[in-house]
Structure formats: structure tokens, C-alpha cells
Curated annotation (Swiss-Prot):
Transmembrane segments: none annotated. Residues 90-119 have a biased composition (Polar residues). ATP binds at G467, P468, P469, N470, T471, G472, K473, S474. Residues 176-342 are annotated as: DNA-binding region. The lineage of its organism: Viruses, Monodnaviria, Shotokuvirae, Cossaviricota, Papovaviricetes. The modification Phosphoserine is found at S90. Residues 90-133 are annotated as: Disordered. This is Replication protein E1. Can form hexamers. Interacts with E2 protein; this interaction increases E1 DNA binding specificity. Interacts with host DNA polymerase subunit POLA2. Interacts with host single stranded DNA-binding protein RPA1. Interacts with host TOP1; this interaction stimulates the enzymatic activity of TOP1. InterPro entries: Helicase_SF3_DNA-vir, P-loop_NTPase, PPV_DNA_helicase_E1_C, PPV_DNA_helicase_E1_N, PPV_E1_DBD, PPV_E1_DBD_sf, Rep_E1_papillomaV, Znf_lg_T-Ag_D1_dom_sf. Its EC number is 5.6.2.4. Phosphorylated.
Length: 638
């Protein structure tokens, strides 16, 4: 029933309304002084009395806004109702399966029913029964079918169900979003997630991820270059990763392609330092906001030309973003001038490198020379060869031959100069003099003994350092042998016929901690060794060799000159006693530093007193000409 005084402006509305007043005048009513009964009321005096222009505009705007809110609320309610009806009402809905898994996890019969439902979802589209709600076809449509219908309808999306009902535009948007979420849920439920990721990567990028990378089984293995693939990344995050990752790397190559899972990001990254897979996973999970199960991380194939060409060509296109300097392994395999540097392997260059760096061990040669492959073309050719073990063995053998011949060609003075040239400056000879004074050894007497010792004078070819334990005998002898690059023999191997074989190429040798049985062995078999005369030693798998015993230092807790049973050794050894315990400071460091730099300073200072020969060609350069086993090259232009 209408209210009196209204003009049906709209039921239930809160807008403005007009009211018409009815005034009746009866005869005999008193008229006020300011009113004239006879005057005609035209209303001209009330024009502009009330300004209702702004009020009417505001009223119209408020009515429009209220109507829009009501319509928007109605549309939202309808969309939510349709979504609930579609996802929760259909038996084929993936969310319905997830709900059943949580509700019926403990029931074995229901688990069997879930397996049947998961198998039913893999059937063909035409075998799916109609749910009766008009959304069956929408659930089974793939994104490709939706795109085709979008193009056929001229850009207006429409999907028809089997019952003939039309879905609204809002339903299509909701279904597309739910479809991508459903795909990720299906990925998480896969028995082999990595296989699903590899398949999707090859489908989207057209190249297998395994063709671009080499596999690291351990997550703790470090590498500076990594290939990373991230699945299901949000579009805004995929764009921001290009700026966020710059602080962690020196170079990156990023590609972003979209599929029904979201954005798949492919990255080739060179980090500022070597990192392992675990560290990179934590970093990318934070930057991309994706779980670890949606990441593939492996190092690239550095020696594959196809991989280098792939990243080089895609880097030139507009589908990728690059930052920093291109890695050298890509440049070397893609640019023409670098391809000319690839040469065949030359063993002489490898031998020259090992000789210059004084490396004679097989394993050390193989390891260190392989690390030069990025900067040395011959090392790169060595890695490409199938005969690396043979080359390493031949290189070590030839290097030892050259080193042995070089050492034999030097006298003691030349060898001391050569050893001093390999050691840096900055030592102090006073450290050695202070230690000898601490052990009550006359410094002048020690220089006289050392002079005859270095010359190999018969009967003065052996120095014995004896004293109580912990007096620094072995420290003093070993530091001297290290500087001279001498050899060490051990009495523990005396049962072998070859325990004296290290004396074959030694300039100086040491026998540490000789016991009483060792002295008896020396007195019985090695008297001529202590004399410094030529003798014969046995070598394994080789013929006997006649050599002159090098100067020998023996450390012992026994003084052979005080033992009458060793009478024949008294004239063959020079004894230097060390009676005092070796001192250390409060931090455990030795008070007297017996280092190579101090020994170099010692010999440089006492060179003339030791009566060592001066090299006549020393002013013109090195004491010996540089060894060169690589043929020279003519660099002159034609």
C-alpha cells in the first residue's frame, strides 16, 4: 500500500522524493498583514530561493552507485554459487578427490574408490558421463580447446555443455584459473615428479633439459655455472626475477614461456662464486616463491657445441634477457676467431709446463694441467683426447729425466744458487745463528764443518747431530734438507735391497733418528758411504748403479764417538751436540724460525766463508740457461 503523499518514486529506494502540500482556505479565516488576498501569486519572488541543482546531482549519483553495488553483489553471488556447484557437486572434480582423500584416508575401501576415480579421470572426453549440472564439457575441455573456440567466435569466449546451456564469461575466467591449479595438483600427485617436469619442459621449449645439462648426483658439489628451470611461476614474479637475481650473479640468460601450468622460467646463471645445488634451491625458492619440487637445477655441458649454440642464438632473440659478460665456454665454441685456436695436442708443451712448474708426480700433473683447459688450447686438446692416462705417464717420465739431468749437471754452488733463485727475499740469517748459539754451538766452527760437508771432503762427508729428545735435531736437519731439496732415507726399510735408491739423484741426504741397531748396520755395511767415496747401490727392476754418496746428515740420541763398539766410525763422522730443549713461545710457535727464506739469507751472507764458487755469468743473467723443449716459432710477418 502506497504511503500518502508519495508519487511512486520507487519501492524500497532511499533516494529523494517530492511532496505536494494541499492547502485549503476557508472563508472567514484571518489573513496576515504581509499577505494580500487580491494579489496574484506568480512565484516570481521565490525564484532562486532554494538552490537544488547540487542536491539533484548528488541524488542521481547516489542512486546510480547503489544500483551498481546491488548488481555487483548479485553477480558475485551467482559466480560463487556456480563455482561451488561445479567444483563440489561434480563427482569428477579434482577438488572433490582431494576432499575425499582427507576424509577417507583411514578407510581402505574408500582408498580403492579413489583409485577408481583417478583412473576414470584419464578416460576420453566422450566417455565422461553427464553430471547433470551443465558443466561436464567445461571440466573436460583442455586449454587448447578453449583457445580454438575463442578464435572461432571472433574473440568472444563461449563454451556449451552437453545439455545446451551457455556458460557466462565469469565462469570461463574462474575455470581457467582452476584449471592451472588442477594441473599443479596433478603434478604433486605424480609418482615421478621429475619425469613430469622434464616432459613439460620439452613440450614447451622444444628441447630436452637433459641435452643442455650434465648430471651432478650430489647436492653438495660446487660449480659456478648452473642451468635452472622453474615451473608454475607467477607472471609478475617471472618478470621481477631479472632484477632480483643480479646481486647474486655475474651473468644470466633468462627465458620465460607460458603454458597451462603458468610460467616456465629457464635460466643459465654464472654466480659470483661456486655454489652447490642446495644453496641455489634455497635462493630460487625465496626469489620465485615456488617449492623445491618444481625446480630442475643442473650444471651445463661446457664442452658441447650444441648447448653453446642454443644459448648463443636464443640470447640474440627477443625471447630472452641477458646480463653480464658471456661465459668463455660459449664464446670459445661460437665465435670464429676462437675456433681457430683449437689445435691438436702437443706433448712437448705439456712437458715444458711440468718442467717449468717443477711438477713430477703423475696425479698432480693430470689435475693441474686439466684446470688450464679454459685458458690453454693445448690443455683443452688434452682433455678432448682419449689417451690422457698415456700422456700423463709420458709427461711425468720425461719431466723426471730432464730434472735428473739438470741436477747432475750442476755443482754444489750452482745448485745452491738455483735453490736460492726459487725462494723469495725477506729472511734473516740471524735466526739460524741465534739457534746455534742457544745450543752452545760455535758459529765459526759450524761454518768450517759445513764448508767441508758441502764440498764432500772424505772423512768429513757426514754430520751427526745428537742430543736428548725434543732439542730440535730433526727440525734443524729437515729444514736444511727442505731448502736443499734433498732426499730422506729411513732405516725402517733396511730389510729391502733398494732402501738406498733415493741417494741416486740426491745432492744432500738425511737419515733421521738413528738407533743403536742402525749404527751397527752402518758400521757393518756403510763405512764407505760415510767416507764420501764411490759405491754401488741396487735399484728396483734396474741394474746396479755406481754413485758417490752425497753429503749425509744423521740425527740420533746416541753419540757414536763415545761408543767403543763403533770405533771405526769415530773418524768418519763429525758430531754436533744439541743439549737444550727447543723453545716455544706462549702461543706454541717456535722461537727460532728455521724457514727457507732464513736459510737463503744464511747462505747469501756466508757465501764467501763457505768457499763457494762464484758464477762468472751471474752478472749476465741466470746461472744456467733456461731449459726449452718446445721448438721456437717464427713470429715475423711475411
Amino acid at each position: 500500500m502506497d504511503c500518502e503523499g508519495t508519487n511512486e518514486e520507487g519501492r524500497g529506494c532511499t533516494g529523494w522524493f517530492s511532496v505536494e502540500a494541499i492547502v485549503e482556505k476557508h472563508t472567514g479565516d484571518t489573513i496576515s498583514d504581509d499577505e494580500t488576498d487580491n494579489s496574484s501569486d506568480t512565484g516570481s519572488d521565490l525564484i532562486g530561493f532554494i538552490d537544488d541543482s547540487s542536491i539533484s546531482d548528488y541524488a542521481e549519483q547516489e542512486v546510480t552507485q547503489a544500483l551498481f553495488q546491488a548488481q555487483q553483489k548479485q553477480a558475485n553471488t551467482k559466480a560463487v554459487r556456480n563455482l561451488k556447484r561445479k567444483l563440489l557437486g561434480s563427482q569428477n572434480s579434482p577438488l572433490q578427490d582431494i576432499t575425499n582423500q582427507h576424509r577417507q584416508q583411514s578407510d581402505s575401501q574408500q582408498n580403492t574408490h579413489q583409485v577408481n576415480n583417478s583412473q576414470a579421470k584419464r578416460r576420453a572426453v566422450d566417455s565422461v558421463p553427464d553430471s547433470g549440472y551443465g558443466y561436464t564439457e567445461v571440466e573436460t575441455l583442455t586449454p587448447v580447446q578453449v583457445d580454438k573456440q575463442y578464435e572461432e567466435n571472433g574473440g568472444l569466449p563461449s563454451v556449451c555443455s552437453q545439455g545446451g546451456s551457455n556458460a557466462s564469461v565469469e565462469d570461463i575466467d574462474v575455470d581457467t584459473h582452476v584449471n592451472s591449479v588442477t594441473q599443479i595438483c596433478e603434478l604433486l600427485k605424480c609418482s615421478n615428479v621429475k619425469a613430469a617436469l622434464l616432459s613439460k619442459f620439452k613440450t614447451v621449449y622444444g628441447v630436452s633439459f637433459a641435452e643442455l645439462v650434465r648430471v651432478f648426483k650430489s647436492d653438495k658439489t660446487c660449480c659456478s655455472d648452473w642451468v635452472c628451470a622453474a615451473f608454475g611461476v607467477a607472471g609478475s614474479v617471472a618478470e621481477s626475477i631479472k632484477s632480483l637475481i643480479q646481486q647474486y650473479c655475474l651473468y644470466y640468460h633468462i627465458q620465460c614461456l607460458t603454458c597451462n601450468w603458468g610460467v616456465i622460467v629457464l635460466m643459465l646463471v654464472r654466480f659470483t662464486c661456486a655454489k652447490n645445488r642446495t644453496t641455489i634451491k634455497n635462493c630460487l625458492c625465496m626469489l620465485l616463491n615456488v617449492p623445491e619440487t618444481q625446480l630442475l637445477i643442473e650444471p651445463p655441458k661446457l664442452r658441447s657445441t650444441a648447448v653453446a649454440l642454443y644459448f648463443y642464438k636464443t640470447g640474440l632473440s627477443n625471447i630472452s634477457e641477458t646480463y653480464g659478460d658471456t661465459p668463455e665456454w660459449i664464446v670459445r665454441q661460437t665465435q670464429l676467431e676462437h675456433s681457430f685456436d683449437d689445435a691438436t695436442f702437443d706433448l712437448s708443451k705439456m712437458v715444458q709446463w711440468a718442467f717449468d712448474h717443477d711438477i713430477t708426480d703423475d696425479s698432480e700433473i693430470a689435475f693441474k694441467y686439466a684446470q688450464l683447459a679454459d685458458i690453454d688450447s693445448n690443455a683443452a686438446a688434452f682433455l678432448k683426447s682419449n689417451c690422457q692416462a698415456k700422456y700423463v705417464k709420458d709427461c711425468a717420465t720425461m719431466t723426471r729425466h730432464y730434472k735428473r739431468a739438470q741436477k747432475r749437471s750442476m755443482c754444489m754452488s750452482q745448485w745452491l744458487q738455483y735453490r736460492c733463485s726459487k725462494i723469495e727475499e725477506g729472511g734473516s740469517w740471524k735466526e739460524i745463528a741465534k739457534f746455534l748459539r742457544f745450543q752452545h754451538v760455535n758459529f765459526i766452527y759450524f761454518l768450517q764443518v759445513l764448508k767441508q760437508f758441502l764440498k764432500g771432503t772424505p772423512k768429513h762427508n757426514c754430520i751427526v747431530i745428537y742430543g736428548p729428545p725434543n732439542t730440535g735435531k730433526s727440525q734443524f736437519a729437515m729444514s736444511f734438507i727442505k731448502f736443499m731439496q734433498g732426499s730422506v732415507i729411513s732405516y725402517v726399510n733396511s730389510n729391502s735391497h733398494f732402501w738406498l735408491q733415493p741417494l741416486e739423484d740426491a745432492k744432500v741426504a738425511v737419515l733421521d733418528d738413528a738407533t743403536y741397531s742402525c749404527w751397527l748396520y752402518i758400521d757393518k755395511y756403510l763405512r764407505n758411504f760415510l767416507d764420501g767415496n764411490p759405491c754401488c747401490i741396487d735399484r728396483k727392476h734396474r741394474s746396479l748403479l755406481q754413485v758417490t754418496c752425497p753429503p749425509l746428515i744423521i740425527t740420533s740420541n746416541i753419540n757414536p764417538q763415545e761408543d767403543n763398539s763403533l770405533l771405526y766410525l769415530h773418524s768418519r763422522v763429525t758430531v754436533i751436540p744439541f743439549p737444550n730443549t727447543f723453545p716455544f713461545d706462549s702461543n706454541g710457535n717456535p722461537v727460532y724460525a728455521l724457514t727457507d727464506v732464513n736459510w737463503k739469507s744464511f747462505f747469501s751472507t756466508t757465501w764467501s766463508r763457505l768457499d763457494l764458487e762464484e758464477d762468472a755469468d751471474k752478472e749476465n743473467g741466470e746461472p744456467l740457461p733456461a731449459f726449452k723443449c718446445v721448438p721456437g716459432e717464427n713470429t715475423r710477418l711475411l
